[in-house]
A protein has these predicted regions:
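Acidic di-acidic motifs
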Residues: 1-5, 52
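N-terminal membrane insertion elements
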Residues: 5-19, 25-29, 59-61, 68-170
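Acidic, metal-coordinating helix/loop segments flanking the phosphotransfer/catalytic sites
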Residues: 22-72
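Conserved signal-transmission helix
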Residues: 172-174
Length: 174
């Protein structure tokens, strides 16, 4: 989570890393107020937060170096005094081209065409309008982590198949 507002970090943590106390609170609230659809997750997400793009880049570079890359980054568009969201995304992708990104913004001061022109067409970018709904964050995190995981598995299988083809080709040449 890359956002200059610490309360946004807490919001993401409450959604993606609910502790047992908050689950009990949700159940009590549901019983009391009749809310039959509280957000629940069995997924285990590792959530790290940065208040500026440069700090996020350092986290991503370290994760890649340690071979524990991030699957998804939720990135705010406005983070004064540092990089804006687009510069942050460009630098994050330079460090890890497989990273899935969700732009989180309350403002529409940058038209989609400008965003697309700057970073190109990609299936690795989604937009989440603030204020966001908990289920939207949870669904985005779940789906994008799954997409990222499947892409890694496919890349591994393609590599294995390529190696197998190379080996068979060498055998046939002999």
């Amino acid at each position: 989570v890359v956002d200059d507002t610490v309360s946004i970090h807490h919001d993401f943590l409450k959604i993606l890393r609910p502790d047992m106390g908050s689950k009990a609170l949700e159940q009590a609230r549901g019983s009391l107020f009749g809310d039959s659809n509280p957000v629940r997750t069995n997924d285990e997400f590792t959530v790290n937060c940065a208040d500026q793009g440069a700090a996020a880049l350092a986290l991503v570079e370290t994760a890649v170096k340690e071979r524990k890359p991030y699957a998804v980054a939720f990135v705010d568009m406005r983070m004064p005094p540092g990089w804006d969201g687009l510069e942050t995304i460009e630098r994050l992708w330079a460090a890890d081209a497989a990273l899935q990104v969700v732009i989180c913004t309350a403002y529409s001061d940058q038209p989609w065409e400008e965003i697309r022109d700057r970073i190109g067409r990609t299936d690795q970018l989604l937009i989440l309008q603030k204020p966001f709904n908990s289920i939207e964050v949870l669904q985005l995190a779940t789906a994008l982590c799954r997409k990222w995981d499947l892409a890694r598995k496919v890349a591994g299988q393609v590599s294995e198949l390529s190696q197998l083809v190379d080996e068979r080709t060498m055998e046939l040449r002999q």
